[in-house]
């Protein structure tokens, strides 16, 4: 039973990642305010290294939420940082 949920969850995650990739292709490098980005994606959008983004997150320069061992950054927070 639990394996069925894991497999279904995995399939859902694959679908979501595919949908997000499609949105990225359609909208290009535009930062979507309601999208949640990983620190790596944020770094790519900002044209910097991931470690730089993580330093700014830890310093409070860019607002983010820690999810497990990773940070997630709302697109509107990236826009806010860029407009400073």
From Swiss-Prot:
The keyword Cell inner membrane does not apply. GO terms for cellular component: magnetosome. It comes from the Bacteria. Keywords: Biomineralization, Magnetosome. Induction: Part of the probable 17 gene mamAB operon. It holds the Pfam family HTH_17. Disruption phenotype: Normal magnetic response, slightly smaller, sometime scattered magnetosomes. Deletion of approximately 80 kb of DNA, including this operon, leads to cells that are non-magnetic, lack internal membrane systems, grow poorly, have reduced mobility and take-up and accumulate iron poorly. InterPro entries: HTH_17, SinI_DNA-bd. One of its GO terms (molecular function) is DNA binding. It is found in: Magnetosome. May play a role in controlling magnetite number and size. Coexpression of mamLQRBIEMO in a deletion of the 17 gene mamAB operon restores magnetosome vesicle formation but not magnetite biosynthesis. This bacteria makes up to 60 cubo-octahedral magnetosomes of about 45 nm in diameter which contain membrane-bound crystals of magnetite (Fe(3)O(4)). Belongs to the magnetosome MamR family. NCBIfam families: excise, MamR. This is Magnetosome protein MamR. It comes from Magnetospirillum gryphiswaldense (strain DSM 6361 / JCM 21280 / NBRC 15271 / MSR-1).
């Amino acid at each position: 039973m639990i394996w069925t949920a894991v497999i279904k969850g995995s399939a859902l995650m694959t679908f979501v990642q595919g949908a997000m990739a499609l949105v990225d292709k359609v909208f290009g490098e535009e930062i979507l305010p309601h999208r949640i980005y990983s620190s790596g994606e944020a770094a790519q959008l900002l044209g910097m290294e991931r470690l730089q983004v993580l330093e700014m997150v830890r310093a409070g320069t860019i607002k983010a939420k820690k999810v497990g061992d990773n940070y997630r950054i709302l697109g509107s927070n990236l826009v806010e940082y860029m407009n400073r």
